[in-house]
């Protein structure tokens, strides 16, 4: 099923999801390094900035994902896509709360933002798995396959 959110035939959603997934997942090791005392305040700042960058980067991923969601017609595929969508709609507010809890935080540092981010990263992994299933198993945003090698016109 070919994506409607594409440039030159290349679907955009798989490109855009790399940004929030990568940044959100990297924020957790930054948090752990800081909270276990293995690094200085720069790790705390890195966690905050990667979370905030992931939130900004999620916007084009959400928009292109929503466009692709609109092309799904098969019921089983729609169920998987709906679960993927719901998880992603939970992720954004979860990470926004984590950012607000960190903003301007002074000692003693709370573990709540780290705990929230941990669950966010777990949900990101589950959602990413489902997104991969939508592409590889259900063919969302995948061009129709050619029947044999290309021929000269």
Role assignments for model-derived ranges:
Residues 1-153:
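Polytopic transmembrane helical bundles with strong interfacial aromatic enrichment
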């Amino acid at each position: 099923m070919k994506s409607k959110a594409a440039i030159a035939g290349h679907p955009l959603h798989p490109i855009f999801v790399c940004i929030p997934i990568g940044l959100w997942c990297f924020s957790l090791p930054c948090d752990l390094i800081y909270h276990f005392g293995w690094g200085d305040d720069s790790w705390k700042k890195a966690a905050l900035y990667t979370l905030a960058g992931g939130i900004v980067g999620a916007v084009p991923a959400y928009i292109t994902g929503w466009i692709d969601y609109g092309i799904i017609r098969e019921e089983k595929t729609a169920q998987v896509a709906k679960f993927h969508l719901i998880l992603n709609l939970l992720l954004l507010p979860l990470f926004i709360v984590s950012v607000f809890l960190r903003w301007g935080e002074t000692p003693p540092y709370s573990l709540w933002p780290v705990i929230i981010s941990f669950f966010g990263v777990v949900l990101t992994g589950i959602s990413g798995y489902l997104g991969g299933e939508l592409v590889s198993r259900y063919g969302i945003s995948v061009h129709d396959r050619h029947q044999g090698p290309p021929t000269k016109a």
